[in-house]
């Protein structure tokens, strides 16, 4: 169990954290009814359940109180300055009361939900008759956006940025919209305390391609995990105390949020034999500095940070010492000492160290102000995952003061910032838990559809996987819906995975080609008599195979196409070249394995087919053009002997390499066993 880092996040080296916007804590029947409707929609495992249609009807009824698009546009154009959504809500509350305010909030959320599901194509139009109009979902999205829904504004801004789904590209307007949403996210401060090595977005398509695949987010939430940690902590396990400390700090997996209990767990982990966990010392320093679970004690914070450094070289501890010095929490402000500590943290790849160092250069504290260099350092903080760095970089690229103005990059940075601030990961993790734990594919499809509307590539790909592979949505148009989604993914992200999946659908005749999208670049080795389906599939394979970063799966599929003559000219040598290129482009063994195996199988297949053809048994499914040099004739005894010898030699080669692989696997297992600690 690895140690935990509570990430110290400071905008300008300040200690205080911004609080989330807090609505009145009174119960609201309107909001509660909306929440029940959403849960009703998510609870079923298939779109065909009667309660799903009922939920759609309720959402449509909730959305019906929203003003028309024309009214909302006139309201916006009639205002001298853009009104913030929170201000509008307060005005409605003051003029009409809390119920009217809540109905406004529910109406815009319902509009966004219905719009996102209609755009995917899984909304029951019989339950929402007005949605039969093909433009309805775009108008609904814009209405929700103009009403101030943050997710709707993100989704509409994303469409303005990329120019798709019937929305004309307008990067300046997209930048303005996403910047406004990002500013709301900034007010929240860091979403929560963070564990080093957060789970990345997970792709369900990898389940079909990697036998060792598992969901990190689900594994981290295993039902018995907390019980195991409690047992280990009772037996004095330092790492278990550290893990339980984190859970108590944030209120995770049934552990009640309790800063005092978190402090005690970290204290136990820090007091064990050998000086305790260095990470626990860092966490104690963080809590002493912020007065979390204990009184503020800057001297004790410095002591714990120093121990974390001496016992484990913990990079964030250097940053913590820098914050103490910068803010003068130990006496006089000392920018020189703060700079030195931030530099030490940055040397150890600490994102907060880089962020604070960048701020020192931008503000000119203890160094000549150099905003351009500060932005360069801020880029590194963003690469390492600092929560606020994308926002600051977005401002820099939008203004063009420290760097050349770049609207597209600024928009992308604000979009990245919004993704983290508005907790897209929670929806994605809940969705994958629906699939793997609860076998609720429909609930997962709903969650992924909402997040994909915001511009999440992984969520969009998972929508496609669920449409193709699950029973969440079983209507006849599910493959066409998947293909439409794949084309949008390709347009927005240039995704090689999406190109391969779309090519597979085209090759198997499950969807019709889009002549303007799928057939715009002819492959020079395309077969003249190939069908439109095969030509379209090949073009997507080629685009993914020969992109800036060649994609192994596309290369191996194109290799098979050349071997079998599917839409391309038959060329055995070209097949082997593509299989080898796929292996070279692979990032891990599960990507490389199909390429290596394809090369071995194709050679053996050609050898066996050649022998079969000589004996007048046919070419074993391979195109005859592979054997154009062979004459159809009966084989003499000597020829039979030669063919038999070739087959035996081929089998011997396979056996030899199989033995090599087994030997290597056995050696790896033995080495791993030797590395395990003895009991």
Go through each PLM region and give its residues.
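Helix-start (N-cap) detector for alpha-helical repeat units in TPR-like alpha-solenoids
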Residues: 108, 150-152, 189, 238-239, ...
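Hydrophobic/aromatic packing residues within the alpha-helices of TPR/SEL1-like helical repeat arrays
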Residues: 95, 141, 178, 229, ...
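TPR/TPR-like alpha-solenoid helical repeat scaffolds
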Residues: 190-219, 395-398, 426-436, 463-469, ...
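TPR/TPR-like (Sel1-like) alpha-helical repeat modules
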Residues: 168-186, 383-387, 395, 404-422, ...
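Alpha-helical linker/edge segments of TPR/alpha-solenoid repeat scaffolds
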Residues: 188, 201-211, 293, 330, ...
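Short coil/turn and helix-start
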Residues: 46-50, 81-86, 100-104, 119-132, ...
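Hydrophobic face of amphipathic alpha-helices that form TPR/SEL1-like repeat modules
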Residues: 58, 62, 111-120, 124, ...
